[in-house]
């Protein structure tokens, strides 16, 4: 991913914003090559990110409407986080807002969620952890209603002291390749698309052609 930033970026600086940054795992590696910052809407995630990356500046905000007093040479939106937008209007607004925070020649990298054509309702996913003092199972089941996909997760976690079971549900918008492209171009970005991407979902690289969105 960092190689793509260097390949496409036309600005001279090395500032980078990770949106959303989650617990800051990406930034552990990014910070060695860029002057990195992170943004996330979840205060608990930000607390972990700050502990993991002391010295990095973090901001609390929503990708739809965050406003920072600076522009960046690169903005990354990875792990299909753009899928938290559930309408095309939100998709366009989030991309436009990130583009507004790019300097001219800066690059926006967006890893998309699964497209409507490729999404398989009823698919199952499992993650298992088997350590001496921790046993964990996470089962996910995917469904779709119209252009909204839902993944229902079931967790079973056991330690020497306790066993817990809990669930959570995540909703993601299903957008076509054309909708991603049009949203990026409408935000003033020249787009290159990599079909394989980082984990097989594709990757959009947009270069800011001017200071106007």
Predicted features and spans:
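Conserved alpha-helix/loop element of class I SAM-dependent methyltransferases that forms part
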Residues: 1-12
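Conserved class I S-adenosyl-L-methionine
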Residues: 12-20
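A short acidic, Gly/Pro-enriched loop at the edge of an enzyme's catalytic core
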Residues: 67-74
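Residues lining the SAM
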Residues: 78-80
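C-terminal lobe and adjacent flexible extensions of AdoMet/dcAdoMet transferase-like proteins
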Residues: 177-213
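A short glycine-rich, Lys/Arg-flanked "PGG" loop and its adjoining helix->strand segment in the class I
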Residues: 92-104
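SAM-dependent methyltransferase
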Residues: 109-181
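Class I SAM-dependent methyltransferase SAM/SAH-binding core
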Residues: 17, 24-65
């Amino acid at each position: 991913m960092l190689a793509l930033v260097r390949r496409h970026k036309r600005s001279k600086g090395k500032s980078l914003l990770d949106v959303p940054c989650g617990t800051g795992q990406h930034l552990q590696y990014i910070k060695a090559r860029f002057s990195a910052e992170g943004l996330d809407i979840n205060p608990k995630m930000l607390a972990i990110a700050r502990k993991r990356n002391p010295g990095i500046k973090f901001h609390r905000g929503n990708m739809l409407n965050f406003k920072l007093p600076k522009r960046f040479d690169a903005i990354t939106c990875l792990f299909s986080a753009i899928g938290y937008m559930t309408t095309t209007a939100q998709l366009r607004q989030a991309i436009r807002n990130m583009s507004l925070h790019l300097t001219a020649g800066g690059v926006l990298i967006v890893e998309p969620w699964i497209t409507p054509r490729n999404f398989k309702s009823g698919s199952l996913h499992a993650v298992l952890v088997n350590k001496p003092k921790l046993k964990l199972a996470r089962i996910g089941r995917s469904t779709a209603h119209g252009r909204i996909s839902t993944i229902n997760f079931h967790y079973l976690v056991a330690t020497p002291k306790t066993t817990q079971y809990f669930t959570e549900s995540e909703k993601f918008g299903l957008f076509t390749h054309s909708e991603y492209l049009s949203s990026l171009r409408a935000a003033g970005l020249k787009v290159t698309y990599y079909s394989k991407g980082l984990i097989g979902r594709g990757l959009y690289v947009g270069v800011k052609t001017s200071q106007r969105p």
